[in-house]
Design a protein with these regions (language model features):
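Helical scaffold of the NTase/Pol beta-like nucleotidyltransferase catalytic core
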Residues: 2-11, 18-104
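Acidic/proline-rich low-complexity IDRs
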Residues: 16, 51, 138-141
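Short amphipathic alpha-helical surface micro-motifs
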Residues: 30, 107-109, 158-162
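Positions that flank functional sites
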Residues: 54, 108-109, 154
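Short Asp/Glu-rich motifs
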Residues: 58, 112-113, 158-159
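Alpha-helix boundary/capping detector
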Residues: 61, 65, 119, 164-166
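Conserved catalytic core of two-metal-ion nucleotidyltransferases
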Residues: 78, 86, 140-173
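Active-site nucleotide-donor binding segment shared across nucleotidyl transfer reactions
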Residues: 87-136, 140
Length: 173
């Protein structure tokens, strides 16, 4: 059975996702360190930080707010860097006449109230069979490593920029 800190975490997560009022007094004395730990573990630290903006009934300790704001600013910068990387990658692929659809991660992040506050990860591209073959030829020489291909899921490569980005392809079979 989830504890009060888990319940408070979900309260803040809902508030951050849907910009709804959050009431934490119902959970009594919450452990903000545990809530932040859960948020980091689930890669939703920025969303939980956004949820804190909607707390109406208790005062969140200043040191907690400062720590979360600092972490969220780092997430925001990582997203800005990733968005620049994605734009450059898509432009490079277009020059090679490769057409891809950005899916999951960075694409879905744009649906969030604060897209830059969502933890960024890898780059997932949906490609036709022909475009996948073209992308393999283009990206493999640039990669720091190339992964084994599987019939249903293909993780093509790790590219060397700051954080490791991957090009994926999932088949519908």
């Amino acid at each position: 059975m989830p504890g009060i800190n888990t319940d408070a975490f979900y309260e803040l997560l809902r508030a951050g996702l849907w910009e709804k009022e959050a009431r934490l007094s119902q959970y009594g004395e919450v452990d903000y360190e545990e809530i932040m730990s859960l948020a980091e573990e689930q890669s939703v630290l920025g969303v939980v930080t956004a949820g804190l903006e909607h707390v109406t009934d208790v005062k969140v300790p200043k040191e907690v707010l400062l720590q979360l704001i600092g972490s969220t600013l780092q997430i925001e910068q990582q997203n800005k860097d990733m968005n620049v990387f994605v734009a450059k990658l898509i432009n490079l692929l277009r020059k090679e006449e490769v057409y891809a659809l950005l899916v999951k991660g960075q694409g879905i992040a744009q649906c969030y109230e604060k897209p830059l506050w969502r933890a960024c990860g890898d780059v997932d591209l949906f490609l036709s069979d022909d475009n996948y073959e073209k992308v393999k030829k283009f990206l493999a020489p640039l990669a720091s490593s190339v992964e084994k291909e599987y019939v249903r899921e293909k993780h093509l490569c790790k590219l060397p920029p700051k954080s490791e980005q991957f090009c994926h392809r999932k088949l519908n079979s």
